[in-house]
Design a protein with these regions (language model features):
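Bacterial N-terminal signal peptides that target proteins for export
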Residues: 1-2
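C-terminal motif of bacterial Sec signal peptides marking the signal peptidase cleavage site
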Residues: 9-12
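Walker A/P-loop-proximal flanking segment of P-loop NTPase domains
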Residues: 104, 108
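Alpha/beta-hydrolase fold active-site loops
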Residues: 125
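The conserved beta1-alpha1 loop
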Residues: 128-132, 205
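Short substrate-entry loop that stabilizes the transition state in hydrolases
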Residues: 135-140
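Gly/Ala-rich beta-loop-alpha elbow adjacent to hydrolase catalytic centers
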Residues: 185, 204-208, 212
């Protein structure tokens, strides 16, 4: 127990953004910087402190926001250039340009439709990101900005952020917060589908996968299902879900019409600790039986052999952003002349391409993201 606790506490010692990470910067946009507009749906409480915006306490209602950010010209794939010493510098840091609360669902939907209209016809897609445990609002927001920039996908980025207290000892609180947010995530997903988007994709990380799969399960059993032709990629990255629970969830689903993309790494130390807390039951994000996951209806993206950007090997899928076109192309070609069920791509092993063949045509380009080292 002492060793496991030490692992968790070391995760919490990594650098994190300051309390003022979201203070808007009015300095001119740096030459070569990229702008990102992120729409937010949140079960967090609003926070009046400058630079915080949302805290880790639970809200009784779903809150909305629209946030404009800029990404510096010196940005490196997979990295977040945090603002330093108070206000950031747009030439070197990711910074918030403008942050606005939205008071109603209608305002959020209006923003979403407006952003979709700025995209080319046929590429008016939505990409929803659901973060994991031990995550500040600012961490989730900047990570989505990194993801949207690195993947270079035209999809409108939407952050669904639930009430994590962003502390290493808050695992149980965070787990309960994720569970409590199921209805609100379902609401957000349905809003995205009602926006007129061509397709909607979802990326969940770590504990956010439990929330996402539960919300999708609710949608499935409600009888008010989503239009299959608008479902893009459902990406489960480093999922902190008990494998037996996942099997039960998918039995209720039945085999999905389009396979889940499960991103795993068998050397994930954060999920190893979660195993310990769960009575040494394996987590989906480190599961060793690819064949069983494929039979359940998944394409498995195994990053075990990829060198991680974080010391806990929990955020490896950050590297997928830069190689998103190649990865999507590999999956898409499975519907054409590809004959192998398993391929290797830059150290990433992809299994279950037979699932992708059955589900053609492919959805929008697969984006990727990661959490900072302390997030699980």
């Amino acid at each position: 127990m002492a060793a496991a606790t030490a692992v968790l506490l070391m995760a919490g010692c990594s650098d994190r953004p300051g309390i003022d990470a979201l203070v808007p910067v009015s300095a001119p946009l740096a030459e070569g910087a990229r702008e990102q507009v992120i729409l937010v749906a949140s079960t967090r409480e609003r926070d009046p402190r400058p630079g915080v915006f949302f805290n880790g306490e639970r809200s009784a209602q779903l809150n909305f926001a629209k946030i404009d950010l800029s990404v510096p010209p010196s940005h490196r794939p997979g990295e977040i250039e945090w603002p330093k010493n108070g206000l950031g510098n747009p030439a070197t840091d990711m910074v918030v340009r403008e942050a606005i609360y939205r008071d109603t669902q209608g305002e959020f939907l209006r923003d979403l439709k407006s952003e979709l209209a700025r995209r080319p016809a046929g590429k008016r897609n939505v990409f929803i990101f659901v973060h994991g445990y031990n995550t500040m609002f600012s961490e989730a927001l900047y990570r989505l900005a990194q993801m949207a920039t690195d993947s270079d996908a035209p999809a409108v980025p939407v952050l669904f952020t639930w009430a994590s207290r962003a502390t290493t000892e808050g695992y149980v609180y965070d787990n309960n917060s994720a569970t409590a947010a199921r209805d609100q995530l379902e609401e957000t997903i349905r809003l995205a589908f009602s926006s007129g988007a061509d397709q909607v994709s979802i990326l969940a990380h770590s504990m956010g996968n439990w929330l996402t799969v539960e919300a999708l399960r609710q949608i499935r059993i409600s009888g008010k299902t989503l239009p299959a032709n608008k479902i893009g990629n459902i990406i489960l990255a480093a999922p902190d879900i008990d494998v037996d629970v996942f099997k039960t969830q998918l039995r209720r689903f039945g085999k999905p019409p389009k396979p889940f993309v499960v991103v795993i790494s068998r050397d994930d130390k954060a999920l190893g600790f979660s195993d310990f807390l769960a009575g040494k039951k394996p987590r989906l994000g480190e599961y060793a039986n690819d064949t069983e996951l494929v039979e359940l209806g998944a394409v498995v993206v195994d990053m075990t052999d990829v060198k991680a950007l974080d010391s806990f090997n929990h955020g490896k899928f950050a590297q997928l952003a830069e190689m998103a076109p190649q990865l999507q192309g590999t999956i898409a070609r499975a519907g054409g002349t590809a004959t192998s069920n398993t391929v290797q791509l830059q150290g990433v092993r992809i299994t279950g391409l037979d699932q992708a063949r059955a589900a053609q045509p492919a959805g929008p380009a697969l984006p990727a993201a990661t959490q900072p080292a302390p997030a699980q």
